[in-house]
Amino acid sequence: MEEEYLNPINIFSEIGRLKKVLLHRPGEELENLTPLIMKNFLFDDIPYLKVARQEHEVFVNILKDNSVEIEYVEDLVSEVLASSVALKNKFISQFILEAEIKTDGVINILKDYFSNLTVDNMVSKMISGVAREELKDCEFSLDDWVNGSSLFVIDPMPNVLFTRDPFASIGNGITINKMYTKVRRRETIFAEYIFKYHSAYKENVPIWFNRWEETSLEGGDEFVLNKDLLVIGISERTEAGSVEKLAASLFKNKAPFSTILAFKIPKNRAYMHLDTVFTQIDYSVFTSFTSDDMYFSIYVLTYNSNSNKINIKKEKAKLKDVLSFYLGRKIDIIKCAGGDLIHGAREQWNDGANVLAIAPGEVIAYSRNHVTNKLFEENGIKVHRIPSSELSRGRGGPRCMSMSLVREDI
């Protein structure tokens, strides 16, 4: 791979053959969800960890069988922190600060607690959370009791499973994202340290957007259609201001992309990101919850070099026609379950549109979305099915559970 790609990040399409991907192994963080708190952590039900791991392993094996190299976010962070005691201590302090621990005694106990763990176990524990009962000798303040969690000193991070969102690969660079929900913001510390300190990634990876921005941006809303064209969703989790900031950064730094299409979709739990209702699966084929244009308002952002300003216009054409125009080819859109009112809504809810392309016309999909998967195959798409009785409880499909790092150029 080093011979083929000079940069550790190489994403210039959604469908080029996938060569390298970032995942997270489901861990004990899922066991720390309870019925009372699961909604706060963006889960609609409690996954059974044993089966979730089995389902995820099927996903991993399909990727490996198709010669995809797999990196794990927890491994990369551990490698960074194992390289320097000073860096490990800095990370611990930042992690505790961003967990909003305010009492000095609790801060000091947590620093000792994490410092005495091996790096691997420390990272795992930071993700799974630290329960109050684990710090038996800790004296909590009134503020800790009143404003903190009754169960955890450090909350679990079950959404680390969805590696698509905390950062996103665009061209040879990345966005380290400002997450919309407070419960997910600590996830991006991992990306910050990987791309600032890891020997494989700290060089030659420009950062187009950073985690301290005021407006939110999440990877489920970021799409690279080709070397000229991006699509960014404006959704429940990504704000319009972030699209403008990202565009300004890309144009200022002379990234190759000349046009950004901003797709505004309804702010709705079922459509939290654009990739829950829309993905590309072949050169000329997309899947969408619906082709009804009431769901999409489209804006075009381009750069005017003469005025040094970003031009923004509202696109009046329909979704299919907009895609056809900017991609220069006729486009087909396969609707979830063919647009059936019952099956379409059910399968979109279970991530029928959230498939991961591993090559042009070849995707990984949840097996439960049988109507949509059959339509894919009838339209010449090769479908690799994975079980999802537990993985789907977090409302994320194969694209959500993966961040593409390297794809073949097309």
UniProtKB/Swiss-Prot annotation:
SUPFAM superfamilies recorded: Pentein
Location relative to the cell: Cytoplasm
Enzyme class: hydrolase
Keywords carried by this UniProt record: Arginine metabolism, Cytoplasm, Hydrolase
Active site: 400 (amidino-cysteine intermediate)
Reactions the enzyme catalyzes: L-arginine + H2O = L-citrulline + NH4(+)
BP GO annotations: arginine catabolic process to ornithine; arginine deiminase pathway
Gene3D superfamilies: Arginine deiminase, L-arginine/glycine Amidinotransferase, Chain A
Domain of life per record: Bacteria
GO terms for MF: arginine deiminase activity
Metal-binding in keyword set: no
Pathway: Amino-acid degradation; L-arginine degradation via ADI pathway; carbamoyl phosphate from L-arginine: step 1/2
Protein's UniProt name: Arginine deiminase
Species name: Borreliella burgdorferi (strain ATCC 35210 / DSM 4680 / CIP 102532 / B31)
Lineage per the UniProt record: Bacteria, Pseudomonadati, Spirochaetota, Spirochaetia, Spirochaetales
